[in-house]
C-alpha cells in the first residue's frame, strides 16, 4: 500500500477504485486489482 499526499490522481487510475474514509484516514481501495491500494493521513 502506498502512502500519498494527494489521492485524486490515484482514483482515476482504474475505474474500480473507490475512495473510503475510515477513522480520519482516506483510503483508495480496489477489489478487482489490489495493487492500486493507497492511503493518506
From Swiss-Prot:
Ribosomal protein listed as a keyword: yes
Domain of life per record: Bacteria
Biological-process GO terms, alphabetical: translation
Keyword Transport: no
This protein's encoding gene: rpmJ
Taxonomy of the source species: Bacteria, Pseudomonadati, Pseudomonadota, Alphaproteobacteria, Caulobacterales
Pfam families cross-referenced by the UniProt entry: Ribosomal_L36
InterPro entries xref list: Ribosomal_bL36, Ribosomal_bL36_sp, Ribosomal_L36_bact
Transmembrane segments: none
GO molecular function, one term: structural constituent of ribosome
Record key words, sorted: Ribonucleoprotein, Ribosomal protein
Similarity remark: Belongs to the bacterial ribosomal protein bL36 family.
Protein name in UniProt: Large ribosomal subunit protein bL36
GO CC terms, sorted: ribonucleoprotein complex; ribosome
Amino acid at each position: 500500500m502506498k502512502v500519498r499526499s494527494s489521492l485524486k490522481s490515484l482514483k482515476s487510475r482504474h475505474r474500480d477504485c473507490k475512495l473510503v474514509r475510515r477513522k480520519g484516514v482516506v483510503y483508495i481501495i480496489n477489489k478487482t486489482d489490489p495493487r492500486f491500494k493507497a492511503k493518506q493521513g
